[in-house]
């Protein structure tokens, strides 16, 4: 890459010409990563201010992005062709140097298609697999565009009434959770290093004072959660009138979490430029039709891209599903972790990072302490922990100090921990989409990973979706899962996810541009593909909707193994009640189930 020589030169010099000197990039030999540390020469000016927020941020090394040779569908009018590389995309030189510093050698498909569209000033809706590089796909063109436009220097700001400082960011990135906002903030800082741009993050769950101090120094790029941003705008600490770029990441998650009123208030009633003036980009792993229709209120003549099958899981993840009772989960988890530890000890490698998902906050804390008592250092992250506790838990997990993290769904989307080797669904989620996002914490950016799910009788509604996903990803499917998938389920649809607002049928993952008669677009695998000028909508259409019905008509109960017990709730009996699941046999555990349940951790 042409920027590589410039990077080497600037690293040796400990700074860049015109950048104020100061910090330096260094390579850590054990991990192959680079990190920035603020040197003694950082005393002020643009780089001095910027370096304060960047000190200690770790930059990922080579990410094996060439493995992303997956199909891409594009629909819309006058679609720019995909870029073969970062330089071909048209990024400015300062951003190219930062791309090289991060060790990115070639763009992923979502980056290859999104960057030319964004740099051309077009509105964009992008659907891509978890871990496919969505964050860089919008951060890179936004930073490049702001640098090319010049303007405010470090942190655009103005004085409002009563001499209070009001930040006037030129780019706004909305994210559903604190963790995702913090991650995007880190990425944006890496890509805007020594460009003169100032990046600020604002989210709830933590005192506002420090965030207000950051904003008073100005912000070119503001990354925020909707609730905290509304609060800051109403306090006259932020003005949205200068917004040139609006990005919504995990847009479906924000709407499902109930942020629609805040988002509409931000976009429509807080003095933000009209959609014909600003540029708007929406990124997510799923876009059901009703969310596409809602999002279209914020977009103008947009281009829709789908990278891979929306809602699918990457084939870099080896998936296993184990049939268990609730009482067997802890014993099987312990056995799984012990076998994993033995393999690591024999190979003298570092303990792999393992993410364990549970349903409740109470179970997260309980399981964490229980694992510690069994000799497995673990931490936990969930909504009841303070922001400081959550950040400390993530830091401890990322560094490997506690290589096991027990989490609720607060950590299931958007978080980028580069080296998660194993995701364990101790409790399965309620929808296939959430399952996909959970296991997407591993197998990221071209790296292989493993995912294990503990399936109980209460997870019957997920059987068909799991079967389809595992079959599509060419995984080994156990016979008992096929049997479960073939039985009708009378508890309502499991394929639309939670809180879906449309009735019946439709696409399971809805990765298709709902606009009719869209113009032609590009279609290809990974690197490019040919141009098709048809009128179709692009994207993929999944299967039909799931089963619907009355209340649950009973469930299986564990006596020995299997056996059907007709339960309360309307809906009638299961016509397949005679087909009990086949018996399973488990390895012997250091501690029996009875001992586990008697240990006081349940």
Swiss-Prot record:
Tell me which residues make up the Helicase C-terminal domain: 328-485
The catalytic activity of this protein is classed by the Enzyme Commission as: 3.6.4.13
* Entry-linked InterPro entries: DEAD/DEAH_box_helicase_dom (IPR011545), Ded1/Dbp1_DEADc (IPR044763), Helicase_ATP-bd (IPR014001), Helicase_C-like (IPR001650), P-loop_NTPase (IPR027417), RNA-helicase_DEAD-box_CS (IPR000629), RNA_helicase_DEAD_Q_motif (IPR014014)
Which sequence ranges form a coiled-coil region, renumbered to this chain? none
For this record, the Gene Ontology CC terms, alphabetical, are: nucleus
Q: What class of enzyme is it?
A: hydrolase
Entry's CDD domains? DEADc_DDX3_DDX4, SF2_C_DEAD
What is the official name of this protein in its record? DEAD-box ATP-dependent RNA helicase 52A
- Ranges for the Helicase ATP-binding domain? 115-305
Q: What residues does ATP bind to?
A: 128-135
Q: Which GO terms describe its molecular function?
A: ATP binding; ATP hydrolysis activity; mRNA binding; RNA helicase activity
Query: What's its catalytic activity?
Result: ATP + H2O = ADP + phosphate + H(+)
